[in-house]
Amino acid sequence: IFLHKLNTILDIGCGEGYLLKYFYEYGYEVFGIDFSRHGIANNNPDMLPFFCQGDCVVELKKMADAGKKFDVVNLDQSLDMMLEPKIVLSLCKNILEDDGVLMIKVANNYSVLQEYLLKTQKVDSEFWLDEEGHPYYFNKDGLIRFLAEAGYRCENVYGESFIDFNLLNEKTNYCRDKSVGKSCYQARIELELLMEHLSEEKTLEIFRLLGEMGLGREIMGVFKKEV
């Protein structure tokens, strides 16, 4: 989406550090924040010099006070896990370049597909609810509104993963038959790898259309701050 156009990347909730490693090897200036160093230390220890362990609210304030700016700020499956996402988004504005990009990926919950599955009784409950892990839930429209209230405009939304389409088929409905879950996941990976092999550009466009329709088990929004 932005390869070779922007060169400083902050990954909030960087986990094992794979995104840092990927862009570092392409020559980007990278930095990551996470509560724990376990993941990055055990998977990409060479990225530890570009890593800070701690509360992202505290660390973002330090960066803003130091005048640090980034071309890209990435929150991959972390915004919906945060207790204070509005504060985090406000702090991100202070460290994001005026023409910078904020990338956010979250689980697509209360999606149009999930609502349809409930309506047609293909699932028996709101299976996506997670009392401990998700303080916030977003679908496409909810994510766009949430970011707009924080002062960001949406440039694009992408839907990722076809796995929940399996719930439409009684033979592959992994909510009712958990034994098929592994094979559904493997099929999803194979399909996406095949699509990318055929055309990365067309695969990206398919994901964009999925996101536009509010489909996909996960959604990724591309935002810029209003200036």
Can you say where each PLM-predicted feature lies in the sequence?
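Conserved SAM-binding loop
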Residues: 1-120, 135-147, 218-225
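S-adenosyl-L-methionine-dependent methyltransferase catalytic module, highlighting the catalytic core
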Residues: 86-91, 101-224
